[in-house]
Curated annotation (Swiss-Prot):
Cofactor: Mn(2+)
Protein's name according to its UniProt entry: Probable cytosol aminopeptidase
Entry GO MF terms: manganese ion binding; metalloaminopeptidase activity
Amino acids binding Mn(2+) 2: 262, 267, 285, 346
UniProt organism field: Protochlamydia amoebophila (strain UWE25)
Transmembrane segments: none
Amino acid sequence: MEFALTLHIEKRKKADVLVLPFWKGTSQPEAAIALHPLKLSLDSVFNTGDFKGKEGETLFLYVEGLVEMRVALLGLGEKNKVSTEALRKSYGCLAKACLGKKLKTLNILMPEFNKTEEDAFIKAITEGLLLPNYVYDRLKSKQEEDDEVTLLQKINFISSNKHVLALAEEVAAICDGVYYTRDLINGNADEITPQYLAKCAQGLSQEYPQIKTTVFDKKRLEKEQMGLLLAVNRGSNLDPTLIIMEYKGNPKSKDHTVIIGKGVTYDTGGLNIKPTGGIETMKCDMSGGAACFGTMLAACHLDLKVNLTAIIPATENSVDAASFKPGDVYRSYLGKTVEMTNSDAEGRLILADALAYASQNLKPSRLIDIATLTGAIEISLGSEASGLMSTDDQLAKSLIQAGENTHERLWRMPLYEGYQEKLKSDIADLKSWNGRSGSSCVAAMFLKNFVGKDIPWAHLDIAGTAYVTEPKKYMPKYASGVGVRLLVEFLKQLSMVKN
């Protein structure tokens, strides 16, 4: 995406469309400087009620004498109810309308805001424009011309605020991480394998010297005795990997955030095989790992002053004669034994080994894991929020605030001691699954057993938000890229506190 800034509307250059924003109930665009130099009368539009300025409402007009072929009127809703999310939605609707008309270049008259909110609102507008500006069509052999998607290529902001470009570029850097994440999730599971993810990590470290990548292959995992990750992998003909990417944005500081993303590149459910209606989207079961890639990429683009390590335990959970059998017991990296009571509760197993490894070897100041862990969280929260479980109130508070800032919202769930009781096994130290009752919280409690003592830890369950079958106002169908904007916002706020 290319950005430009024009300080005066009469000096703008040729584009496919001129966008004029309106608050609901007004007939003057924001900012009102637009009408006079344009000599554009919109009385008939408002008198007929064809356009009312409702949130996300878009009306295209064809006006002669302008440098644009079209004028788009964009409704922002009620001015006294404006919020970052309302602006994301309105400009997301605009972006989708422009994509539908195959427009490439936009001249956008920016609304005027008070100084305290201006930066946040400009970022939200840019997010609304960029987040829908994505398509995954590389698997189509040929498309009819009418079906081809033409993405937005250039946005010229018309504004007196000279900081607009810097803010837009910052958002674009984060959205690049979101796109990268979506591509990994949307790709064929036969392509996006544990080995492919390892190559992606190595490719990032070649492109960005700030990243150091280490990959544990199966032989190294056996040496490390990561018994749970290896157990999940037994049914696959593809070896597992453990990917470690280290980014040192503040080498003088000992503060160190470790994020761990579930990387099940395809989840059949194992011998407890998933049914039709539940298995078809299971290429998305590595969404947590993909979000770690996107976060690392954005951290490099933004030159974040933090020390960050991302760990992705990657494997398929496939069906084979060698698949681990429900009821069998395996030893974890930590040494605790686990009775495998359901082969479709595999994500917590590979995360457990990764959490224990990070706790013992990386000296984390905080641990955050992100995973499509339980279907129960989708039943509880739908696609409106991800689940959060945490042992540390301050960490939870910071993540929740980052979620509010980005609208990748989190809802905190409890870690009551009673959930630990459900993990008791007669034949092992722990059992991996104990039925449907409280299953999201019980799964998180299982993970807690593998986190080092006194290490602040948070678990993000994104099973309901990572892959959506209905598009939203500024989100396409399927992979959402959830977690990237949230984690980057958390890291940005952390860098302000620690530096």
